[in-house]
């Protein structure tokens, strides 16, 4: 649990990821629920979106987050609501899943999981009927569908 909460906070420099993505992916559901209930810091969300190399507004819309609320909470050093935190951690968990997949392949040199995932999320996926995976991130069920699609890439079911 401590790695989930402090894994990326040890050195919060500009290039430091806001989450320990792989630890988050590998953590037990009970551990992730604990982090969700504490709430994700709005400032960590902003750093996470920066790591994804995507416009903040695009990702806020994808996660069904209100820009004004996130900005206010970030300015006041407050956490997001439980519901918002769950969707944010779900997306961070997808980055961890991707990191785990790439590590299993043995080709990790120079691979930027957040950036790759961000690009993949914004491309129509035939296996999803041509839907962009980013359009499914606003619900946990949608995130589960995206997770399965990501896993199927690794298994070779589709690309």
UniProtKB/Swiss-Prot annotation:
Subunit description: Forms heterotetrameric ParS(2)-ParT(2) complexes. The 2 antitoxin fragments do not make contact in the crystal structure.
Entry keyword set: Toxin-antitoxin system
Residue ranges that the Swiss-Prot or TrEMBL entry lists as coiled coil: none
Protein role: Antitoxin component of a type II toxin-antitoxin (TA) system. Neutralizes the bacteriostatic effect of cognate toxin ParT by inserting into its active site.
Alphabetical list of InterPro entries matching this protein: Xre-like_HTH (IPR046847), Xre/MbcA/ParS-like_toxin-bd (IPR024467)
Domain note: The C-terminus (residues 99-159) is sufficient to bind and neutralize toxin when expressed in E.coli.
Sufficient to neutralize toxin: annotated segments: 99-159
Official protein name in the record: Prs ADP-ribosylating antitoxin
UniProt family annotation: Belongs to the MbcA/ParS/Xre antitoxin family.
GO molecular function: DNA binding
Domain of life per record: Bacteria
């Amino acid at each position: 649990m401590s790695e989930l909460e402090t894994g990326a906070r040890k050195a919060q420099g500009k290039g430091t990821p806001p989450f320990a993505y792989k630890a988050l992916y590998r953590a037990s559901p009970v551990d992730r629920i604990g982090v969700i209930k504490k709430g994700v810091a709005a400032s960590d969300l902003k750093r996470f979106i920066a790591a994804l190399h995507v416009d903040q507004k695009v990702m806020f819309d994808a996660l069904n987050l209100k820009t004004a609320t996130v900005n206010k909470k970030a300015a006041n050093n407050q956490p997001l609501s439980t519901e918002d935190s769950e969707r944010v951690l779900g997306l961070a968990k997808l980055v961890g899943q991707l990191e785990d997949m790439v590590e299993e392949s043995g080709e990790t040199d120079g691979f930027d999981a957040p950036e790759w995932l961000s690009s993949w999320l914004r491309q129509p996926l035939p296996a999803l009927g041509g839907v962009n995976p980013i359009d499914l991130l606003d619900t946990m069920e949608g995130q589960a569908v995206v997770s399965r699609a990501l896993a199927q890439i690794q298994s070779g079911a589709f690309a």
